[in-house]
Regions:
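Conserved N-terminal catalytic core of the sugar/cofactor nucleotidyltransferase
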Residues: 1-7, 14-18, 22, 30-115, ...
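Short beta-strand segments
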Residues: 7-9, 57, 112-115, 144-148, ...
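Generic helix-packing signal
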Residues: 9, 45, 100-101, 133, ...
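Extracytoplasmic/periplasmic beta-strand context in beta-sandwich domains
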Residues: 26-27, 157
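Residue-level signature of transmembrane alpha-helix interfaces in integral membrane proteins
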Residues: 27, 69, 75, 131-133, ...
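Generic anion/oxyanion-binding catalytic loop in active/binding sites
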Residues: 27, 85, 196
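Conserved core of the sugar-phosphate nucleotidyltransferase
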Residues: 120-210
Length: 210
């Protein structure tokens, strides 16, 4: 199936102030390499098969900055969707899905939703997880990516999964918003709780029908 990356780049990056500012938030900064976090997000998709032009969802004030950074890495076939005001991720993802359907790009395509400010080192494992997710999405599933927790972090949401694995994936039992310290420690002791990465794979019509 075709893969249409959807890059969520609307964050304000206020937690990294003063390095990250409202008009120049962290996703546009080069923090771990000579490329910005937005650019790295797209470049780490190199090597995957059937990648289509990406959709970048961003704040209206950042539209020219996004276009400039995409041009710098030779991404010329992109779509930039503008948010007049910052909202949470759900409306941004829905807008991207509607755009794909309206532009008649949906046929045999999945959306790969990624945040523009993630740091991912193990690209091989990342690509493997994406390919597993695509196989699941072919069966009209909405797939999310969990991260194995390394500490009882209360800054992340968590995913509770079933114990049984099927084709490299687990069934989601529930999503838990940021827990308190005691609850986070309990999650860390179990093997079926993961940090919610905010990354997804699905067919556009499946999300809209939800």
């Amino acid at each position: 199936m075709k893969i249409i990356p959807v890059i969520l780049s609307g964050g304000s990056g206020t937690r990294l102030w003063p390095l990250s500012r409202k008009q120049y938030p962290k996703q546009f900064l080069a923090l771990d390499s000579q490329k910005s976090m937005l650019q790295e997000t797209l470049l780490r998709l190199n090597g995957l098969s059937n990648i289509e032009g990406p959709i970048v969802v961003c704040n209206v004030n950042h539209r020219f900055l996004v276009a400039e950074q995409l041009n710098e890495i030779d991404v010329f076939d992109s779509t930039i969707l503008l948010e007049p005001v910052a909202r949470n991720t759900a409306p941004a993802i829905a807008a991207a899905a509607f755009n794909v359907i309206q532009q008649k790009r949906e046929g045999k395509a999945v959306l790969l939703v990624l945040s523009a400010d993630h740091l991912i080192k193990d690209i091989k494992a990342f690509h493997k997880a994406i390919n597993i997710a695509i196989e699941c999405a072919k069966h009209e599933k909405i797939v999310t990516f969990g991260i194995v927790p390394t500490e009882a972090n209360i800054g992340y949401g968590y995913i509770k999964t079933s114990k049984s694995e099927k084709n490299g994936a687990f069934k989601v039992e529930s999503f838990i918003e940021k827990p308190n310290q005691i609850t986070a420690k309990k999650f860390l002791e179990k093997d079926n709780y993961f940090w919610n990465s905010g990354m997804f794979v699905f067919q556009p019509h499946v999300l809209i029908n939800e």
